[in-house]
């Protein structure tokens, strides 16, 4: 099958990560405000370099790899603004999950909706998932709002289900079925 990359949206380019993305990724993942709702704290340059080594291989969901992770760049400037992913959580039940991190300078401009929509499309249309979920810390209103704007429904609010950096935190779970995706796409085309 031919590579689908890069993927172009109205304002973004989505492509696999490259070694030269190191500085831009350190500028994102090295920030406390980016990591405050994640399982880890700010990442060092060495941590990010190690991640990039793994991310560079996550370009399709195959029998050997169960994740697709893409860099989002602004068209025209080629500034890397975020990290978007979709991965398999169950082969048997055709389940997946999406994730996203956007540099704070580029939040609130609709870029995350653009890129995350591509990841849902990849999950449902290219990878054949029946259901795609997304999770976030309940205090992360921006992520919860993004998943709702994507058309994902809130399915659960788990209370104190994770110990993150010494604090018990909950999880909001959102999801969308392939039939819901298809209906939303049909409405968008009408």
Regions found by a protein language model. Name each.
Residues 1-105, 122, 126, 167-190:
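GNAT-family acyltransferases
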Residues 17, 133-135, 153-170:
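Conserved catalytic-core motifs of GNAT/GCN5-like acyltransferases
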Residues 44, 139, 162:
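Positions that flank functional sites
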Residues 100-102, 108-125, 141-149:
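Conserved acetyl-CoA-binding loop-helix of GNAT-fold acetyltransferases
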């Amino acid at each position: 099958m031919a590579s689908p990359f890069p993927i172009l949206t109205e304002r973004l380019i989505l492509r696999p990560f490259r070694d030269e993305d190191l500085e831009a990724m350190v500028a994102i993942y090295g920030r406390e405000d980016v990591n405050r709702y994640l399982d880890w704290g700010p990442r060092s340059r060495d941590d990010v370099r190690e991640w990039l080594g793994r991310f560079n291989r996550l370009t399709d969901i195959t029998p050997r790899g169960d994740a697709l992770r893409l860099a989002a760049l602004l068209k025209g400037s080629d500034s890397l603004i975020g990290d978007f992913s979709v991965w398999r959580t169950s082969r048997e039940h055709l389940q997946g999950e999406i994730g996203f991190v956007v540099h704070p300078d580029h939040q609130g401009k609709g870029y995350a909706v653009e890129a995350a929509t591509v990841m849902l499309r990849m999950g449902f249309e290219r990878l054949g998932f029946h259901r795609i979920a997304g999770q976030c810390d309940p205090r992360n209103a921006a992520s919860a709002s993004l998943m709702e704007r994507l058309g994902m429904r809130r399915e659960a609010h788990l209370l104190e289900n994770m110990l993150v950096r010494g604090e018990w935190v909950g999880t909001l779970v959102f999801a969308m079925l392939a039939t819901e995706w298809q209906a939303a796409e049909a409405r968008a085309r009408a």
